[in-house]
From Swiss-Prot:
Role according to the record: Required for the assembly of the mitochondrial NADH:ubiquinone oxidoreductase complex (complex I). Involved in the assembly of the distal region of complex I.
GO cellular component entries: mitochondrial inner membrane; mitochondrion
Keyword set, alphabetical order: Membrane, Mitochondrion, Mitochondrion inner membrane, Transmembrane, Transmembrane helix
PANTHER family: DISTAL MEMBRANE-ARM ASSEMBLY COMPLEX PROTEIN 1
Main location: mitochondrion
Database matches in InterPro entries: DMAC1-like_dom (IPR028036), DMAC_Protein (IPR053117)
Region of interest called Disordered, as start-end residue ranges on this chain: 1-39
Membrane topology: Multi-pass membrane protein
Protein name listed in UniProt: Distal membrane-arm assembly complex protein 1
Signal peptide positions (record): none
Length: 116
């Protein structure tokens, strides 16, 4: 599926016939529950500018979603169920995009919750 440009270029390069590569040694299976890459998790925890940038981006996206849903209501149109859903997704306490941005900035690793 997709165009040829969306596929990686390496998949179209073939080795000349007669030169076979040695089979690669498969990686050991990951243990369940173990993080796949420690560097991935460490970056968001230690890089304050990364947290601020991603948090503000999410807060801006949530505000935009709310604003787009609110704009027809300001013009006098009655709200539809989809409009209310957009407003909830934009700024809701539990599942909103803007709230997600606040959590990324304030508590990126979930240290505020006790793990039992």
């Amino acid at each position: 599926m997709g165009s040829r440009l969306s596929q990686p270029f390496e998949s179209y390069i073939t080795a000349p016939p007669g030169t076979a590569a040695a089979p690669a040694k498969p990686a050991p299976p990951a243990t369940p529950g173990a993080p796949t890459s420690p560097a991935e998790h460490r970056l968001l925890k230690t890089c304050w500018s990364c947290r601020v940038l991603s948090g503000l981006g999410l807060m801006g996206a949530g505000g935009y979603v709310y604003w787009v849903a609110r704009k027809p209501m300001k013009m006098g149109y009655p709200p539809s169920p989809w409009t209310i859903t957009q407003m909830v997704i934009g700024l809701s306490e539990n599942q909103g995009i803007a709230t997600w941005g606040i959590v990324v900035m304030a508590d990126p690793k979930g240290k505020a919750y006790r793990v039992v």
